[in-house]
Swiss-Prot record:
Domain notes: In the 80alpha procapsid the C-terminal 21 residues of SP form a helix-and-hook motif that interacts extensively with the major capsid protein, especially with the N-arm (approximately residues 26-70 in the capsid protein).
Organism placement in taxonomy: Viruses, Duplodnaviria, Heunggongvirae, Uroviricota, Caudoviricetes
BP GO annotations: symbiont-mediated suppression of host innate immune response
Quaternary structure and interacting proteins, as annotated: Found in the procapsid with the major capsid protein in a 2:1 capsid protein:scaffold protein molecular ratio.
Annotated Polar residues bias: 173-192
Native source species: Staphylococcus phage 80alpha
UniProt keyword annotations, A-Z: Host-virus interaction, Inhibition of host innate immune response by virus, Late protein, Viral capsid assembly, Viral immunoevasion, Viral release from host cell
Gene Ontology CC annotations of this record: viral scaffold
Protein name: Capsid assembly scaffolding protein
Length: 206
């Protein structure tokens, strides 16, 4: 009944990259993919920049997944060890052992209930921030304490939005002031907000 939990502080998500090809860097590459900002101006997202953003997030998710896998293996080894220990016990020892295990299971159920409640709250906070609230992300930010979970949600939301903002700034600097295909003014009546731009680029999702 043990459940994998990823316990970590997402403050490192806020670190700004020095890679010139990542959002916030100084890379200047072409082949743009255009989107609009909230002023109705088309924003250029180069494939290289989008690839870098995706790689950063994927690496960090993979890192936490690896930790979760290692945690699961440790728990499996502990379970095998306990089974071998139980096989060597006499009746009284087994009764005492089983009683202790039952108490642990009850405590685990209480912890799981609390964890599920925190997952629901974390998903709500991510949705309100217009950030991806999938099970994978929720499992990354949720810990066994409400305070740390809230801190993780805020750090993750801010980091993703910062990456999008930096990409917008970089593309604005790279685009020519007049003419060209990479930076044009739009006259559409319905501007896209930050979340809509990011959602189309697979960074922020509903």
């Amino acid at each position: 009944m043990e459940e994998n939990k990823l316990k970590f502080n997402l403050q490192f998500f806020a670190d700004q990259s020095d890679d010139p090809d990542e959002p916030g860097g100084d890379g200047k590459k072409g082949n743009p993919d255009k989107k609009e900002n909230d002023e109705g101006t088309e924003i250029t997202f180069t494939p290289e920049q989008q690839k870098k953003v995706d790689e950063i997030l994927e690496r960090r998710v993979a890192h936490e997944k690896k930790k979760a896998d290692e945690y699961a293996k440790e728990k499996a080894a502990e379970a095998a060890k306990e089974a071998a220990k139980l096989a060597k016990m006499n009746k009284d020892q087994k009764d005492e052992y089983e009683r202790e295990q039952m108490e642990k299971e009850l405590e685990q159920l209480r912890s799981e209930k609390q964890l599920n409640e925190m997952r629901s709250e974390a998903r709500k906070m991510l949705s309100e921030a217009e950030v991806d609230s999938s099970d994978e992300v929720v499992n990354l930010v949720v810990t066994d304490t409400a305070e740390q979970t809230k801190s993780n949600v805020e750090a993750f939301s801010n980091a993703v939005k910062k990456a999008v903002n930096e990409a917008v700034k970089v593309n604005a600097r790279q685009s020519p002031l007049t003419g060209g295909d990479s930076f044009n003014h739009s006259t559409k009546n319905k501007p896209q907000n930050l979340a809509e731009i990011a959602r189309q680029k697979r960074i922020i999702k509903n």
